[in-house]
Swiss-Prot record:
The keyword DNA repair applies. It is found in: Nucleus. This is DNA repair protein rhp42. Has a role in the nucleotide excision repair (NER) pathway. Acts in both transcription-coupled repair (TCR) which removes damage from the transcribed strand of active genes and in global genome repair (GGR) which removes damage in untranscribed DNA. Involved in the repair of short-patch mismatch during meiosis. Residues 48-61 have a biased composition (Low complexity). The lineage of its organism: Eukaryota, Fungi, Dikarya, Ascomycota, Taphrinomycotina. It comes from Schizosaccharomyces pombe (strain 972 / ATCC 24843). InterPro entries: BHD_2 (IPR018327), DNA_repair_Rad4 (IPR004583), DNA_repair_Rad4-like (IPR018026), Papain-like_cys_pep_sf (IPR038765), Rad4/PNGase_transGLS-fold (IPR018325), Rad4_beta-hairpin_dom1 (IPR018326), Rad4_beta-hairpin_dom3 (IPR018328), Rad4_BHD3_sf (IPR042488).
Length: 686
């Protein structure tokens, strides 16, 4: 008796069940309920996403659209029923075994509504959807998505404001603008300029000059427009009408015209005062107290009507009692920076800079917070000088600058300012950085995890493979972790006592060698990159049954490698017939490096001793391939080899050009012949 075959997927039992599922009666009430629930789900999902639209229209759903939605729901239910049928068929039954391939295809089920149901009235329930930019929820409840969105907005807004200040600072260095302001100052205040030029330019003379400029600029500049103002997060229901027109310049010419006319916003007035000081060859900075939207989901940074300018005010923006822009002047005699504000505070500040920090409930109501202060130099660089104007320990500053990243010691603002920082720093910059860093308190680690990557303290267990302690390093304290019998104590060292160590091979690539008699700072397991080195290590491990160790040395244990000078025009070579030339100092005295491709055959042709210059290695397929760049030849023969190389290159280029010219002529000849043939065919057979 032949064995019974398993029931196929197209069995009658499975097919009948599918048919019953797909032929559910299309009850209008059921359809109405289904559409409404799907609409509600869509509303909930859309309300979580920010929308760029200021108004929302109610969704208009046609009859066909809702029927299609219902059919899709039925098909999904059918597919889920199909999965359960397949599971039942795998179990097998005597009833299904009687049917095998009688039905090779499924019955086509019509999912469209039948005629009887079309005659019934279908009621479509719609609901007004109001998308929001920010979720209106109870205080203290915020999702991870809201926090992520606000953090992205904070980073983007901070970057845009920083770039805005950089553009304005670049405009303030325009020579036409500086000449115009200087001429205006000489015309209106000749005595102030003359007194400064004729003085010895001491600290008192500088203060006298700044006070004179401040008073004249404050009286002469007319505030006619609004400056920067942080409005906070708004919902779409609140709209996009901010209630006032801010000052906008489309190009530098509009900016220059407004500044020379002494009319504009208080931000423009503060920027113009910086340019005025620069026109007198003073080392002046443009200071910008950035006011980005915060990354916190708390309600204190949401929009409120109190943020807008007061309509009853007699002067524009006088409700903002603290400046956004001001000026710093470097005092050469005192070696320090002086802060000057000629618009809002209208004063000169030499020591106490906290006058610029917004304080009190009124400043909070206007969303004025000092968290990021940027200083733009004459040379178009920028740096963070926040610590000069505010207390790093204040809770207000921590709320603004404490951005959480995977690395809790990563300073996002420092990384961004690093892109605008000066590369070649002078003594003044170094002294200022040390002064500002001295105001940053060191956060004391309290747990085992706090010691990892801590900028001040370190545990021995947290040292990397290439890090080691100096021999004279001493523990500054002892940290205890755990409680009771599980408590352990470890010695804590200073991070400055940790040095970076390297192998002798790595130092050789830098042109340095280990000093005689130096002992390694650390012994670590040797690494093998190439196949030959791996085999060597495996052979040594098999012989000694111990891992291969390698010594690491710090930079103070090395000295510059000085190769022996060449003698009698003979270039010394290594075992591979070339010479290591990783840095310029590795070229021996009496030799010259000619880093030109193909120059080796010229030296060989002239019968001059040479060696290929190895300048690096490429690692491919577990093999170290040396990279050669030119040759090393005796110094007295270098000029002759170079001139012969130029002559050969000239001949080679001429031959290459002749070859290319011949190819081009051949292509033109082929094209002209084709055109002649085409013309003859058209004349004969057209």
């Amino acid at each position: 008796m032949p064995p019974k075959r398993k029931a196929s997927k197209n069995s009658v039992r499975g097919r009948k069940r599918r048919t019953r599922t797909n032929n559910l009666p299309l009850n209008p009430e059921v359809k109405e309920e289904t559409v409404v629930s799907s609409t509600h789900r869509q509303t909930r999902s859309q309300s979580k996403k920010p929308s760029l639209s200021s108004s929302a229209e109610p969704p208009s759903e046609s009859l066909d659209d809702n029927i299609s939605a219902l059919n899709s729901l039925q098909r999904s239910a059918s597919s889920s029923e199909k999965g359960s049928d397949e599971d039942n068929e795998k179990l097998g039954s005597s009833e299904d075994d009687e049917f095998d391939d009688d039905f090779d295809t499924w019955e086509q089920v019509d999912l469209s509504p039948n005629k009887q149901e079309d005659k019934k009235d279908l009621h479509i329930v719609t609901q007004h959807i109001t998308p929001q930019l920010t979720k209106e929820s109870k205080k203290g409840s915020s999702s991870a998505m809201d926090k992520s969105i606000r953090l992205s907005i904070h980073i983007m807004h901070f970057t845009c404001l920083l770039y805005h200040g950089s553009v304005r600072n670049r405009w303030l260095m325009n020579s036409l603008l500086l000449d115009g302001l200087r001429d205006l100052l000489v015309e209106k205040q000749p005595s102030v300029v003359e007194a400064w030029v004729c003085s010895s330019q001491t600290h008192e003379d500088l203060l006298k000059l700044l006070n004179g400029l401040r008073m004249w600029w404050n009286k002469s500049f007319k505030i006619e427009s609004h400056g920067l103002r942080k409005l906070g997060y708004r919902t779409l229901k609140q709209g996009f009408d901010i209630g006032f027109s801010p000052e906008i310049f489309h190009n530098f010419h509009e900016y220059q015209a407004s500044l020379l006319s002494l009319k504009g916003s208080r931000d423009l007035a503060a920027q113009g005062f910086t340019a005025l000081c620069r026109s007198l060859n003073l080392k002046a900075r443009l200071i910008f107290s950035l006011q980005p939207l915060t990354f916190s989901t708390a309600s204190y940074d949401d929009w409120s009507p109190h943020i807008l300018p007061e309509e009853t005010s007699t002067s524009i923006d006088d409700d903002l009692r603290y400046p956004i822009f001001w000026t710093e002047i470097y005092d050469q005699s005192e070696k320090k920076w002086i802060a000057v504000d000629a618009v809002v505070l209208n004063g000169v500040y030499t020591n106490d800079m906290t006058w610029f920090e917004p304080k009190g409930a009124y400043a909070e109501s206007k969303h004025l917070r000092m968290g990021i202060v940027a200083a733009y130099d004459n040379d178009l660089y920028a740096k963070d000088v926040t610590l000069r104007y505010t207390d790093y320990q204040s809770s207000r500053l921590k709320k603004i600058r404490h951005v959480s990243f995977a690395d809790k010691y990563f300073d996002f603002y420092k990384a961004i300012f690093g892109q605008l920082a000066k590369r070649n720093k002078d003594a003044e910059d170094i002294y200022e950085e040390k002064e500002l860093e001295s105001k940053v308190p060191i956060r004391e680690p309290k747990s085992f995890a706090d010691f990892k990557n801590h900028p001040e303290f370190v545990l021995i267990r947290h040292l990397r493979r290439e890090e080691a302690l100096l021999p004279n390093a001493k523990p500054v304290k002892t940290a205890t972790f755990g409680n009771g019998k599980k408590a352990t104590s470890e010695e804590v060292y200073l991070r400055k006592d940790v040095v970076i160590c390297k192998t002798p091979e790595n130092y050789h690539k830098e042109g340095r060698v280990i000093k005689e008699g130096e002992q390694p700072r650390k012994m670590v397991k040797a690494r093998a990159v190439t196949i030959s080195r791996k085999r060597e290590h495996e052979f040594r491990v098999a012989e000694t049954n111990e891992p291969v160790l390698q010594g690491l040395y710090s930079s103070d244990q090395t000295e510059l490698y000085v190769p022996p000078p060449i003698k009698d025009g003979i270039i010394p070579k290594n075992g591979y017939g070339n010479m290591d030339c990783f840095v310029e100092s590795m070229i021996p005295k009496g030799a010259a490096h000619l880093p030109y491709r193909g120059i080796a055959k010229i030296a060989k042709k002239l019968n001059i001793d040479y060696a290929d210059a190895v300048t690096g290695f490429e690692f491919r397929k577990h093999r170290a391939i040396p990279v050669t760049t030119g040759i090393i030849v005796p110094e007295e023969s270098a000029q002759m080899v170079y001139e012969e190389f130029l002559e050969c290159e000239k001949i080679r280029i001429e031959k290459q050009q002749m070859k290319e010219r011949k190819i081009i002529y051949g292509q033109w000849k082929h094209l002209l012949n084709a055109l002649r043939i085409r013309k003859r065919i058209e004349e004969q057979y057209a």
